[in-house]
Amino acid sequence: MGRINTKVPPVAAFYDDLAPHYHLLYVDWERSVAKQGEALASLLSAFGVTVADPILDAACGIGTQTLGLARLGFNIAASDISLMAVERLQQELVQRGLSARTRVDDLRTLAQVESSSLAAILACDNSIPHLLSDRDILQAFRTAHRCLRPGGLLVFSVRDYAALPRVNPDVRPYGLRHRDGCRFLAVQVWEWEGEQYDLSMYLTSESSSGECNTKVLRSRYYAVSIERLQSLLAEAGFVEVERHNDILFQPVLTARQRVV
């Protein structure tokens, strides 16, 4: 019988279950890896971060950003709260002949990162809104501030919730994919409750014989506004807080550790 770990945080459990399928949420994951790597490399370079500087992808998932930057030669480490996502990233690195230090860690604490040790920290793909309160988000920002060296750069991407209509329930299909002779369909359902919403991810696989299997993964998000995030960044001690709309498919926020 498999072990059941009752101590796994809900967000970690969600991404543990999603890790084998995550690439299928993209029309072409390999292309997205390359495209996002190039976009982030240009952004980092514009802020003076070089390939030799120490960088942490602190919400790495299965490696959509880490793999692209590692392929371009960046000195990148990667962490995530999901063990299964980190293990999937390790497999992807080996398959590509790439190298990056990987570990399980919590974005709110980054307990394994030394203070003032990093030139840049990344947290992309709407990872911040998994933190369900301003208090938790502020803790994550203060932790990033601790880990960055003077002048260091924080980069994260989020949904612009203020621009989204509130439909309840909100059904969001990803589209049909094909894998190993099977058809795969992923659908998100958002159910709003105030400024938060429960997300149900329906993953359906159809075999060549027509047999279907559906698994439902559940998580919760805080629809925090970009304006509020900018305020929390300033409260955490960051300066030069900027929004960029032309880097990734979601808005990107950058902020710097003050130069002493």
Language-model-detected regions and their locations in the chain:
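Class I SAM-dependent methyltransferase SAM/SAH-binding core
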Residues: 64-109
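A short acidic, Gly/Pro-enriched loop at the edge of an enzyme's catalytic core
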Residues: 112-121
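A short glycine-rich, Lys/Arg-flanked "PGG" loop and its adjoining helix->strand segment in the class I
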Residues: 138-150
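Conserved hydrophobic residues forming the short capping helix/wall of the S-adenosyl-L-methionine
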Residues: 44, 90-93, 233
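C-terminal lobe and adjacent flexible extensions of AdoMet/dcAdoMet transferase-like proteins
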Residues: 222-260
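Conserved class I S-adenosyl-L-methionine
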Residues: 2-61
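SAM-dependent methyltransferase
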Residues: 155-227
